[in-house]
Swiss-Prot record:
The keyword S-adenosyl-L-methionine does not apply. Homotetramer. Keywords: Dioxygenase, Heme, Iron, Metal-binding, Oxidoreductase, Plasmid, Tryptophan catabolism. It comes from Ralstonia nicotianae (strain ATCC BAA-1114 / GMI1000). Pathway: Amino-acid degradation; L-tryptophan degradation via kynurenine pathway; L-kynurenine from L-tryptophan: step 1/2. Binds 1 heme group per subunit. Heme binds at H303. Pfam families: Trp_dioxygenase (PF03301). Its cofactor is heme. The keyword Zinc-finger does not apply. This is Tryptophan 2,3-dioxygenase 2. Belongs to the tryptophan 2,3-dioxygenase family. PANTHER family: TRYPTOPHAN 2,3-DIOXYGENASE.
Length: 369
């Protein structure tokens, strides 16, 4: 085996030969088009890293038993994916060194190509757990998969990648929720124990609302303002109970509601009693999941603002509504909605209900779930 050089190991020669544009001739590519190509190639490499880290975290949570030290490894992978998204955000600044006129000089050569055809970005969405019925149509009435097809309707290599990802296995969300449903709530996984904890917590939520209302009264707020707060707190209390007891969907069967209660109770339990040793890493995992989704939402928003700054609100090269579509994805593409909702229900430490089996969450060698 010959000695390895940096140039050969990184395959720089091959990388530097990939900026030839539509005709494969780099001599015909101007500096602005070269910038466009390189930045998007770098994005695809970042997406590859994110997919690797998310797959690792998903596979870890897919195990029947997840040892505590492995949760730390999952957190590390999620934090790396977060760091990659944050770094990718900086690349939009490089793109913004290109003016609208610069881009328009070569934009028509891209048609009907579109960033929407990034199979790896679609893979990230699928791996996270974005459902088909939650997607925004890229064109009038069209499936996101239609945009990945070749002009003649045949499947492209990008379409095959997405199909393979869908067939490969469960999403990170599915595995996370399955893992959460196994976390003992106050020492027990029994549905009755879960419901008892939730009832106790709902009682604490209502007591906290009453305390806040009394504070408003004591500070001599105007009667109309007090009544407005009273109505708001009552609505919040009803919403909290409906969510925690999984009663928001009257069509859901008893088993579905039971599973939702277990997951939501676990989210609330881990966040509320995070000082307990065995809940420390689970809490870091949930925090990392939220930060991951936040970093992707920020990336989507930054992407939309970069596009708007350069070309305004033109129709996209692939026929989409352009910036309007990008803005909608930034607003509506939320995967871990229950985690975000739980943040609205957290109480200060002195207000959370006491638990009976706190000692069972002390340091131990065995896995929590």
């Amino acid at each position: 085996m010959k000695p390895m050089s940096y140039w050969d190991y990184i395959k720089v020669e091959e990388l530097l030969a990939l900026q030839g544009g539509a005709n494969g001739d780099e001599t015909q590519v101007g500096n602005d088009e070269a910038l466009f190509i390189v930045v998007h190639q770098v994005y695809e490499l970042w997406f590859k890293l994110i997919l690797r880290e998310l797959t690792f975290a998903r596979d870890l949570l897919r195990q029947d038993t997840v040892p505590g030290h492995q949760i730390a490894l999952g957190v590390r992978s999620l934090r790396r994916a977060i760091a990659v998204f944050e770094q990718a955000n900086q690349h939009f600044r490089v793109m913004e060194t290109m003016t609208a006129r610069d881009f328009l000089d070569f934009r028509e050569r891209l048609m009907p190509a579109s960033g929407f055809q990034s199979a790896q970005l679609r893979e990230i969405e699928i791996l996270l757990g974005l459902e088909d019925n939650e997607r925004i149509a890229v064109c009038q009435g069209g499936s996101f998969k239609d945009a990945l097809k070749l002009p003649n309707g045949a499947l492209s290599s990008a379409a095959y990648r997405v199909e393979a990802r869908e067939a490969h296995g469960q999403s990170l969300k599915h595995c996370l929720y399955a893992w959460l449903s196994r976390i003992p709530i106050d020492g027990s996984n029994e549905p009755a124990a879960v419901k008892r904890f939730l009832r106790d917590y709902i009682g604490s939520v209502r007591a906290e609302s009453q305390r806040r209302l009394q504070t408003a009264i004591d500070r001599q707020l105007a009667p109309a303002e007090v009544e407005r707060l009273r109505a708001r707190y009552q609505a919040d209390d009803v919403g909290a109970e409906t969510f925690l007891l999984a009663e928001e969907d009257p069509q859901a069967d008893a088993m579905t509601r039971e599973k939702r209660r277990a997951v939501r109770a676990a989210m609330l339990f881990v966040e509320s009693y995070r000082e307990l040793p065995q809940l420390a890493w689970p809490r870091e995992l949930l925090e990392s999941i939220l930060e991951l989704e936040q970093s992707m939402l920020i990336w989507r928003q930054r992407h939309a603002r970069m596009v708007e700054r350069i070309i305004g609100r033109r129709v996209g090269t692939g026929g989409s509504s352009g910036v309007d579509y990008l803005d909608q994805t930034a607003l509506r593409y939320r995967v871990f909605t229950d985690l975000w909702t739980v943040r609205s229900l957290l109480l200060r430490k002195s207000s959370v209900p006491p638990i009976r089996q706190g000692a069972s969450y002390a340091f131990a060698e065995e896995a929590l779930v």
